[in-house]
């Protein structure tokens, strides 16, 4: 993007201008693209995420440092480190007022987006009404509603809204004057760009919109798709849109919740849809797992390649170092070899050491001689006359030539360009403090703490308010005194002292004798200096050779003895170490074996006790199970008899009821017939016939019914006696049996416990 900076008048601004904050200093000028806290104040300042918001906050904190330099009047003009001329103090004033929120504004957008998603997924959710602010189409947001085609070679005109074009007069620079003009600290400039802001935005601008109540446009369901994250749409996004449409169509076919008759159908449809969604999610998860697996394999492969590359670099570096060391060592050996060979050849040429006269003809005929190539180690330097071949240059050897050469040089050679030093970058690309800056800050804090501790003035001790007890010093030890002894003890002490002197003298004499014996060869070697004649010198030389041979033999013998002793000591040490190791391991093994044996004995004893207790409990349990089985059998028998009697009663009652119903039906039929006959006979009968009918009814119905009732009552009384007797027999037998079983079980348990204790005592005595 190209920028053209122009200075404009305030009354005519048809182009889009940007206000910048410019600070001028003596060394130069520094222009910042925005202010420190624009991310909190400016509503048009947008950060992409909470991470960028935090980074902007950190940068603002670093730019607007709250550390203040306060001069020290005592050491104001000092340059010493331990006497600084100023101190750093943390300013309590915060440039951001407390009512300004420092939180990221994107959380509100996320909340509204979550409400929109909830309204899309849940049709019963009522989205709260949003109060939109004035978009200010003709105000500050006017540039957002412009539309202009991108024509790079088209003449730049104002946007589709035509305003009166104001002609800007060209700016003419005033003539330079010797008087220095005042430079303002702030300056407002306008910046005209070749492109609109929308052309360089990472995320295309989305205009504000208002959603009608109870309507969910399909376009809003795709609000989560942003540029680079779903846009431009691919195969996956198209499938997602198709699934969303199918789900909305399926939701439209669902029965209403108010229809209770279709509730089961709605539940089945929802379960089926949920199974389909879960199956789709499982497929997506499997795809993601496969993709992650491939990515992991690729990362592992790259890591292995990088590791191999690093290893190869290390190996190559090590190989190159060893190769350089080898070459250097070989070169040194080669130089030493050449020098030694040269010396040997020189010595071999003149073995007898005779002096030879120089052959000048031979020297001048041999071009490898020192006449043509003298050796510098012998003090000859053939390049002493090299100044004779130096080229004399006019421009380098004369002042006039240097002046002429300097006049042809460009200005920046003689007049160096002064560039403002770049600000020290103390943050990384991610917005975090660098390690060096953090260490500088920590060192400054430590230095400040040390200075505070060093310059801390001790407060004068205040007089005590109350009386204090003075500690009493401990008494000194008594001075030792020497008691006078008797003459006999004094003589004994003097004799002991004399004996000690004799012993010390003898020890010193022995040490001198041993030293003389050790240095006897050196003494004899010193004595050889007094031999002046040839015979004596030869004798001394032979003695010296014999002595040196003896010394070498002695040293060799001592070396062999020391080697043998070292080997023997090593073998002895290893044997002792192995023996002590074996003995310590055997001791530990025996201790562990005894401890394990004790644990085994204790576990065996506990096992026997538990087995005895378990056998007693098992016998009691078996006895109780037998009793319960007998009780259960008796109860089952009683239940079977009760059920059989109950079923018999039910069957009899059912038969009686059935017979009664059938009899009643037949009686009703017969009654109808008899009634018809009776009516007919009634219409024909006489008084005697009426008396005969009454007597027949009494003898045929009333008397048999009374007899039947009496018979039933007798049967019921007889059965009641038998039932009471059966109940008494059953309950009396069961209670006596249960009591008897309990007493027998307690007696058996006591006898078993006594037997187990006796067995345990016998086992302990045997062990």
From Swiss-Prot:
Signal peptide: none annotated. It comes from the Eukaryota. InterPro entries: CFAP91, CFAP91_dom. Its main location: cytoplasm. Keywords: Cell projection, Cytoplasm, Cytoskeleton, Differentiation, Mitochondrion, Spermatogenesis. Residues 1-29 are annotated as: Disordered. GO terms for cellular component: axoneme; mitochondrion; motile cilium. Residues 8-19 have a biased composition (Polar residues). Phosphorylated by PKA. One of its GO terms (biological process) is cilium movement. Coiled coil: none annotated. It is found in: Cytoplasm; Mitochondrion; Cytoplasm, Cytoskeleton, Cilium axoneme. It holds the Pfam family CFAP91. Part of a complex containing MYCBP, AKAP1 and PRKAR2B. Interacts with MYCBP and AKAP1. Interacts with CFAP61. Belongs to the CFAP91 family. Involved in sperm flagellum axonemal organization and function. May regulate cilium motility through its role in the assembly of the axonemal radial spokes. This is Cilia- and flagella-associated protein 91. It comes from Macaca fascicularis (Crab-eating macaque).
């Amino acid at each position: 993007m190209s920028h053209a900076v122009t200075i404009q008048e305030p009354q005519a601004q048809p182009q889009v201008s940007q206000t910048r904050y410019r600070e001028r200093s003596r060394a130069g000028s520094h222009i910042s693209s925005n202010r420190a806290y624009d991310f909190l104040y400016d509503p048009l300042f947008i950060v992409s995420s909470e991470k960028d918001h935090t980074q902007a906050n950190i940068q603002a904190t670093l730019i607007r440092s709250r550390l203040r330099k306060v001069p020290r009047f005592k050491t104001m003009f000092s340059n010493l480190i331990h006497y600084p001329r100023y101190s750093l103090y943390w300013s309590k004033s915060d440039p951001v007022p407390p009512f300004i929120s420092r939180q990221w504004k994107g959380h509100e957008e996320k909340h509204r987006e979550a409400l929109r998603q909830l309204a899309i997924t849940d049709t019963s959710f009522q989205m709260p009404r949003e109060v939109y602010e004035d978009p200010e189409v003709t105000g500050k947001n006017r540039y957002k509603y412009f539309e202009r085609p991108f024509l790079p070679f088209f003449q730049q005109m104002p946007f589709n809204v035509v305003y009166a074009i104001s002609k800007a007069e060209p700016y003419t620079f005033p003539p330079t004057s010797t008087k220095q003009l005042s430079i303002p600290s702030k300056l407002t400039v306008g910046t005209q760009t070749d492109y609109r802001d929308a052309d360089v935005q990472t995320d295309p601008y989305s205009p504000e919109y208002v959603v009608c109540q109870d309507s969910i446009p399909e376009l809003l369901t795709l609000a989560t798709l942003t540029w680079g994250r779903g846009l431009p749409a691919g195969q996956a996004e198209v499938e997602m849109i198709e699934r969303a449409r199918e789900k909305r169509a399926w939701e439209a076919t669902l029965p209403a919740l108010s229809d209770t008759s279709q509730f089961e159908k709605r539940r089945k449809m929802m379960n089926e849809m949920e199974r389909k969604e879960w199956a789709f999610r499982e497929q997506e998860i499997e795809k993601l797992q496969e993709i992650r697996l491939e990515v992991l394999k690729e990362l592992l492969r790259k890591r292995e390649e990088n590791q191999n590359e690093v290893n190869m670099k290390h190996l190559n570096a090590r190989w190159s170092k060893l190769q350089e060391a080898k070459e250097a060592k070989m070169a040194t050996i080669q130089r030493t070899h050449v020098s030694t060979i040269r010396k040997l050849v020189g010595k071999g040429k003149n073995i007898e050491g005779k002096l030879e006269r120089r052959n000048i003809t031979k020297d001048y005929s041999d071009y490898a001689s020192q006449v043509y190539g003298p050796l510098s180690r012998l003090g000859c330097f053939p390049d002493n006359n090299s100044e004779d071949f130096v080229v004399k240059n006019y421009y380098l050897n004369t002042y006039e030539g240097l002046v002429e050469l300097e006049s042809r040089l460009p200005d920046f050679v003689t007049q160096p360009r002064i560039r403002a030093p770049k600000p020290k970058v103390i943050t990384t690309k991610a917005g975090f403090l660098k390690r060096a800056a953090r260490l500088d800050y920590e060192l400054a804090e430590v230095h400040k703490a040390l200075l505070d501790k060093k310059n801390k003035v001790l407060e004068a001790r205040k007089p005590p308010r109350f009386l204090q007890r003075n500690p009493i010093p401990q008494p000194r030890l008594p001075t030792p005194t020497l008691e006078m002894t008797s003459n006999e003890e004094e003589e004994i002490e003097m004799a002991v002292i004399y004996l000690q002197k004799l012993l010390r003298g003898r020890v010193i004499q022995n040490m001198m004798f041993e030293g003389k014996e050790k240095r006897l060869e050196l003494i004899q070697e010193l004595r050889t200096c007094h031999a002046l004649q040839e015979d004596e010198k030869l004798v001394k030389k032979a003695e010296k050779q014999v002595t040196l041979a003896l010394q070498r033999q002695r040293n060799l013998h001592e070396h062999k003895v020391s080697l043998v002793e070292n080997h023997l000591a090593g073998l002895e040490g290893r044997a002792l170490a192995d023996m002590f190791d074996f003995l310590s391991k055997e001791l530990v093994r025996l201790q562990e074996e005894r401890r394990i044996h004790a644990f085994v004995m204790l576990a065996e004893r506990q096992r026997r006790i538990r087995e005895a207790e378990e056998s007693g409990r098992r016998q009691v349990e078996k006895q109780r199970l037998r009793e319960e089985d007998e009780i259960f059998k008796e109860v089952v028998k009683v239940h079977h008899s009760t059920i059989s009697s109950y079923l018999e009663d039910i069957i009899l009652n059912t038969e009686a009821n059935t017979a009664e119903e059938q009899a009643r039906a037949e009686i009703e039929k017969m009654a109808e017939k008899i009634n018809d006959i009776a009516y007919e006979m009634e219409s024909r009968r006489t008084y005697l016939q009426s008396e005969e009918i009454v007597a027949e009814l009494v003898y045929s119905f009333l008397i048999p019914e009374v007899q039947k009732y009496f018979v039933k009552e007798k049967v019921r009384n007889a059965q009641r006696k038998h039932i009471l007797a059966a109940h008494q027999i059953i309950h009396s037998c069961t209670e006596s049996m249960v009591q008897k079983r309990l007493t027998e079980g307690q007696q058996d348990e006591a006898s078993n416990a006594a037997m187990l204790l006796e067995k345990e005592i016998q086992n302990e005595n045997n062990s």
